[in-house]
Amino acid sequence: MRPATIMLPPGDMEAIGIIEFVHGMCEHRNRYNHVLKYFSDKGFICAIADIKGHGENVLTPDDYGYFGEDGYKGLIQDIDDYTTFLKREYPNLPLILIGHSMGSLLVRGYIKKHSEKIDALVVCGSPSENSFTELGKILIRVMEVFVGNRYRSPFISRMLNGPFEKPFKKDGIKNAWLCSD
């Protein structure tokens, strides 16, 4: 099982449901601790696991952002494994699946195959198509042939993220554009 956090409601409070979170790009489960606490204090069992290539799944610098040999399909399977585990541990509670940013893309893919396993879905910060998406996919496939599937191209990063990073440049925080007040 991937590195994960489960936060239960305090004391004798009876759980009213499960909220499973799927985090975004360049994030990890510990960034959500305050969110888990907020909802667990309201009576929810809150759960989040690090996506491959993120958080405690990263053992070497080459692991950052690497989704494994199965890529997207493997991430969908990881979500299903964790959801199945949560439903087995807490069988009589409704499960709400929340995906943020890249996690929103993953949960949208997940419900195409497994909608019967969840009771509600929340999609937030979902990225939209941009004019470079298809070109980016082609460039990434070509680059994989020459430099392997773990190579992180600064060019591709600038092409895909540059427009979002520009307004936050003065903050001096890498990936500040991912989430702001």
Per-segment meaning from a language model:
Residues 29-31, 36-62:
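Conserved alpha/beta-hydrolase
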Residues 1-10:
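A short loop-to-beta-strand scaffold at the N-terminal edge of the catalytic core in hydrolase folds
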Residues 99-109:
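Glycine-rich nucleophile elbow surrounding the catalytic serine of serine-hydrolase chemistry
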Residues 109-181:
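Alpha/beta-hydrolase-fold enzymes
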Residues 90-101:
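Alpha/beta-hydrolase fold nucleophile elbow
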Residues 16, 21-27:
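Active-site glycine-rich loops that stabilize anionic/oxyanionic intermediates
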Residues 67-87:
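Alpha/beta-hydrolase active-site loop
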